[in-house]
Each structure stands twice: as C-alpha cells, then as structure tokens.
C-alpha cells in the first residue's frame, strides 16, 4: 500500500529537463499561508517550507497571506495555481476552495464539499459510521450539562474538543465529571459545536495519503509516542520529546490493514490530492478506530506527511511538487468540465 509513484526530481532529474517542463506548465504559483484561523502560526511555518521547496524545484512560487490580501488579487496578478498551506477554518473548510473555484485557479487538496465535510468531525464520523467504518462513540454537545451527560454515557477518559478545529487546539482529556464544565468552556471558545468522544487507549498512528480516485495510495504508517501520551499542540510543533516511529513496527499484517482503512476513509469523503488520517489502535483488541482526517496537512519540520514520504524515499521538495502537480478545480471556470491533474511525472 505504500507505493509512491513520485520521481524525486531533486536527485533524479537533470536540470532543465522534466523539472523545467513541470515548472513551466505550473506557471506562477501562490503558496497560501497564514490566514485567520487559530492555526495561523503553524500555517506560516508550513507555507515557508513549501515556498522554499518549490523555488528549489524551479517553480515561480510566491507567498500569499489571505489575512493580509484579498484573494481577488490572485487573478489580477496572474497566478495560475495555488498551493494551499492554510490550516483550520477559512483555509481547509471549503471557503478558500470555493473562492478559488470562482476565480478559476486550480488548487491543491480536496474540493469544496470534501473540505467542508472533513473539517467537521461530527459530520465526518457520521459518514464513516454510515459506511461501516469504525470510529469511537461520540456525542455532540452544546452545554456543560450535556458534556456531563456525555461523560456518564461514554465513560472515562473522554475527549472533549471543538468540532471544527485542528492541531489539538481546545482539546481536553476528561477523567472526572467535575472537569466537564471547564473542558466544554475551553472547546466552546473555539467553536459553538463541541464533540465529546470516547477515548481509545492504545497506539496512536497516522497515515498520509496521496493522489486521487483509483490512483490514491497510502504512505508508510507513523506511530506517535508522546510524553505521557499527551500529543498536544506544544508537543506537536515545538518540542523534540515526541517520538515518531516509521516504520511503525506494528504486528504482522496490521499496517496494511490500517492503510486500507485510511484509504477507504479518504475516498468515502470524496477527498483528493492529499490528506492525513489519524487512527487509534485499541491496546486490548488491536481494533483500529478512525479519529479524524486532515485535508491540508502540516508541512513544518515536525510534520508527519514529509516524515512518511522521506521514509518512502521521497524528498520534501519532490513531495511538494507532487502535491502541486495534482492541483485542480471541481469545475472549470467555463464549460463545467472538471480539470484533471497532469500525467507528466514530477
């Protein structure tokens, strides 16, 4: 399942041949970074990494912060493609994707509908459940009292988090009913919709995915070992104490099964281009449970998609170019025909 199908242009292609052709076809590229979400700081780190990687591959790439500039300027300034390195709301929730559809500028990652569904954890879980895919039990709550009721139903520990945030922002692991009020208040500061989810004790893994349709495939599974099991915002991005194990050293046959599960989770939501699926493996039964999907994954020095790609022999610059090569639109600006990614190797 971890076949790649990417040429590492940085090491395999002579200057001025295939890479030059790809860069010329892509034209002027905007790397969208920053934005107005709670994940702005991480987005800026991702965007700067992507920007420098694309430039190193000969792409005419430029930084563009939608929090500081109007998206309409993309058309005025002649940008022909966008690499979306935005995270969270107003970046990976379908809003920017919809604007780029109207502007007729192909962009990386999932389209409008898949993006808007995937950022909504409750809606995502409902779809996965309807498709027979395993995900932890949950309750959607709108008050501290409802959070306490969810705790009584789901048991301890319970995860309380905003429905439409990422990077563990606003998340609390609740072990006593007295913590429910504060946990709800923290999550509700970030979103009016709050999710209470049954905690699964076991191995935390993540599975990056690349490609679209029948060409989509999983990269190697990464197992995450955080200090005291606390994979929070700080441990994700700003410390070196979290261990990332790739190969994940899972029992025989388990990695392939989890890759297939992640691929199915990606496909039933209609995702394309790339994403990352987070999974918990029950310590007792070894059953995997889908947690959530990220349709605009981080590309920082601590990020997981570049880590999995590297384990598969793909450099960071080649990964960025491959993601950009799949930039497309739901519908063309005129005529209504869906644009397809180039079949030219990156």
Curated annotation (Swiss-Prot):
Main localization (coarse): cytoplasm
InterPro entries associated with the record: ATP-grasp (IPR011761), ATP_grasp_subdomain_1 (IPR013815), D-Ala_lig_Van_CS (IPR000291), D_ala_D_ala (IPR005905), Dala_Dala_lig_C (IPR011095), Dala_Dala_lig_N (IPR011127), PreATP-grasp_dom_sf (IPR016185)
One Pfam assignment: Dala_Dala_lig_C
One GO MF term attached to the UniProt entry: D-alanine-D-alanine ligase activity
Transmembrane segments: none
Residues annotated as binding Mg(2+) 2: 292, 294
Gene Ontology annotations of biological process type: cell wall organization; peptidoglycan biosynthetic process; regulation of cell shape
Cell wall biogenesis/degradation as UniProt keyword: yes
Positions contributing to Mg(2+) 1 binding: 278, 292
All residue ranges annotated as the ATP-grasp domain in the record: 125-325
Compartmental location: Cytoplasm
SUPFAM superfamilies listed in its UniProt record: Glutathione synthetase ATP-binding domain-like (SSF56059), PreATP-grasp domain (SSF52440)
GO cellular component term of the entry, any: cytosol
Binding site for ATP: 151-206
Catalytic activity line of the entry: 2 D-alanine + ATP = D-alanyl-D-alanine + ADP + phosphate + H(+)
Superkingdom of origin: Bacteria
Chain's role: Cell wall formation.
Family classification: Belongs to the D-alanine--D-alanine ligase family.
Protein name, entry field: D-alanine--D-alanine ligase
Record organism: Albidiferax ferrireducens (strain ATCC BAA-621 / DSM 15236 / T118) (Rhodoferax ferrireducens)
